[in-house]
Curated annotation (Swiss-Prot):
<keyword id="KW-0732">Signal</keyword>
<comment type="function">
    <text>Beta-hexosaminidase that shows a broad substrate specificity.</text>
</comment>
<dbReference type="GO" id="GO:0016231">
    <property type="term" value="F:beta-N-acetylglucosaminidase activity"/>
</dbReference>
<dbReference type="InterPro" id="IPR029019">
    <property type="entry name" value="HEX_eukaryotic_N"/>
</dbReference>
<keyword id="KW-0378">Hydrolase</keyword>
<dbReference type="GO" id="GO:0016020">
    <property type="term" value="C:membrane"/>
</dbReference>
<dbReference type="Pfam" id="PF14845">
    <property type="entry name" value="Glycohydro_20b2"/>
</dbReference>
<comment type="similarity">
    <text>Belongs to the glycosyl hydrolase 20 family.</text>
</comment>
<keyword id="KW-0325">Glycoprotein</keyword>
<dbReference type="InterPro" id="IPR029018">
    <property type="entry name" value="Hex-like_dom2"/>
</dbReference>
<feature type="glycosylation site" description="N-linked (GlcNAc...) asparagine">
    <location>
        <position position="313"/>
    </location>
</feature>
<dbReference type="InterPro" id="IPR015883">
    <property type="entry name" value="Glyco_hydro_20_cat"/>
</dbReference>
<dbReference type="GO" id="GO:0005975">
    <property type="term" value="P:carbohydrate metabolic process"/>
</dbReference>
<feature type="signal peptide">
    <location>
        <begin position="1"/>
        <end position="20"/>
    </location>
</feature>
<dbReference type="Pfam" id="PF00728">
    <property type="entry name" value="Glyco_hydro_20"/>
</dbReference>
<dbReference type="InterPro" id="IPR025705">
    <property type="entry name" value="Beta_hexosaminidase_sua/sub"/>
</dbReference>
<keyword id="KW-0326">Glycosidase</keyword>
Amino acid sequence: MRFAYLATLAGSLLAGLAQAVKVNPLPAPQHIKWGESGPQYLDWNVKYSGPRDRTIIAAWRRTWGSIVQLRWTPAALEAPIPTFAPFIVGNGKRDAHSNRRILRVSVKVENTNVDLQHGVDESYTLQIRDKSDSIRITAKTTWGVLRAFTTLQQIVIFKRGRFLVEQPVDIKDYPLYPVRGIMIDTARNFISVKKIFEQLDGMALSKLNVLHWHITDTQSWPVEVRSYPQMTEDAYSRRETYGPSDIRKVIEYARARGIRVVPEIDMPGHSASGWRKIDPDIVACADSWWSNDDWEKHTAVQPNPGQLDIANNKTYKVVEKVYNDISRIFTDDWFHVGGDELQPNCFLTSKIVRDWLKQGSRTFNDLLQHWVDKTVPMMKKVKKNRRLLMWEDVLLSGNMHAHRVPRDIIMQSWNGGLANIKKLTARGYEVIVSSADFLYLDCGYGGWVGNDPRYNVMENPDPETPNFNYGGNGGSWCGPYKTWQRIYNYDFTDGLNYAEKKRVIGAIAPLWSEQADDVVISNKMWPRAAALAELVWSGNVGKDGKKRTTLMTQRILNFREYLVANGIMAAPLQPKYCLKHPHSCDLYYDQTVIM
């Protein structure tokens, strides 16, 4: 099936291309130098030579198995706009080393025992010398070797029944940021383990290394908790749950590909399903009408409402057991505990909260501080190296925010773009960027709440100005749709000083699942997530100081085809004509308009 797809994809690409074929991978390496000696063929069974490390050996088998199975040929190579001086094909030497073959991959690793945790070294070198019979890879850790393998996958192509790679090639590569990821939401709609594996495959190919797993929310509770098995009564069905064995499968699959899995249990907001099955008294406003038909009185930003009653002492005993049980399953040092979108009106439905606020003229900010003071020490003690993550709302929300949050807690910034990143880093916090205006992959698909009279408009009320149904966002609060160029061109450290830039530790692109499930998740995630992958691996600026968006275009179009060939149902970004005719679909002929 895949081979048939690739046969049609390859078409006539290499019919007249006996010259060198330099296929630049995605993400672009930090340093790559191609020679001009012509192609070198690879043996059909390139042997592994290196440490007897199970993770590396398994990764090599997957890598070479993929190369052999896919027999990949890109639909079109990187190319300058027509009439520009060519720079990607070689000097015309034809099959210069057809009598020589690459027989093995030689791997050297300084330390194969380094755990896959935050900050692990992922650097590598990959070298194929002129007329050599081996591919040489060096790395400081196992995880660097895995990154080298994914680069190798993309630079080997299939031509006339043989595998070839241009040589010599010398790559020295490492990531700009230690956190490079995507977020999946398995509460609004369930995502199967099989589809999670598919996202992990895409992540591995694009060198993303953190899967942020937003497991629970108000709508459903799909994860089994040993202390409270009744919580999954609020799953959508018995089959739409994750048991400990399911989670371990995801963790093992991810780890084999150099990907960390960071769980999120969103608290104290977005908390109704599951929790109410333990004790309805620990959940506030779950039975309220979420919008109250009057936005000033809303108890939630979307249906269904519910927040943990953080003035109720019983809440903390339950939270501790749930958190401890889930922490035992996940192996990463990090754990995300939410903290976003708390609604004061929800808390006001609780008599316990109202009585608490009356004592000493307390405020909602004091109430959230009470939650932070009670839960943070409890959550940190579970694991020696535990680090907590929270959404930025806990510090920056206009509704309610804590006065003090320990600075070792990592803040995930989703609102306010550059301004909020600046505020957080200036206060000394490490920050993960997830700005909705640039990185939310669910935006731009229109509204989803029902019984909405705003759509009942037959004539444009203001032809001169974009509005709800005519040129506006159509109910998508974070519209418009985030194109790959929007993502790729995001300079999220703009305006920060040196110290503040050092506190930005990476970026994660969320895909909230109000309108996503198994059927469409890969289509919405990919290949746009690959634009973020390059942004946080090697940046969006070339050695000449100019943005390389125009060079990225052909690589991401080819990468989309590569994802599909690997079983990842990525969406097309342009008509296929554009893929096969590089730059023919650019808005401007002038390739320097993006600086």
